[in-house]
UniProtKB/Swiss-Prot annotation:
Membrane topology: Single-pass membrane protein
InterPro entries on file: PSII_PsbJ, PSII_PsbJ_sf
One of the record's GO cellular component terms: photosystem II reaction center
Originating species: Phalaenopsis aphrodite subsp. formosana (Moth orchid)
UniProt keyword terms in alphabetical order: Chloroplast, Membrane, Photosynthesis, Photosystem II, Plastid, Reaction center, Thylakoid, Transmembrane, Transmembrane helix
Domain of life: Eukaryota
Protein name as it appears in the record: Photosystem II reaction center protein J
Function of the molecule: One of the components of the core complex of photosystem II (PSII). PSII is a light-driven water:plastoquinone oxidoreductase that uses light energy to abstract electrons from H(2)O, generating O(2) and a proton gradient subsequently used for ATP formation. It consists of a core antenna complex that captures photons, and an electron transfer chain that converts photonic excitation into a charge separation.
GO biological process: photosynthesis
Family of this protein: Belongs to the PsbJ family.
Principal location class: plastid
Subunit structure: PSII is composed of 1 copy each of membrane proteins PsbA, PsbB, PsbC, PsbD, PsbE, PsbF, PsbH, PsbI, PsbJ, PsbK, PsbL, PsbM, PsbT, PsbX, PsbY, PsbZ, Psb30/Ycf12, at least 3 peripheral proteins of the oxygen-evolving complex and a large number of cofactors. It forms dimeric complexes.
Length: 40
């Protein structure tokens, strides 16, 4: 992990993107399961 060229590391971007995607999918499925996703 020494490939830090002054920008944000690629693994950090991938990790944050994965967490956001999993969170959005989880919220979407939880909302549809609770009956709140029908308004979306």
């Amino acid at each position: 992990m020494t490939d830090t060229t002054g920008r944000i590391p690629l693994w950090l971007i991938g990790t944050l993107t994965g967490i956001l995607v999993i969170g959005l999918i989880g919220i979407f499925f939880y909302g549809s399961y609770s009956g709140l996703g029908s308004s979306l």
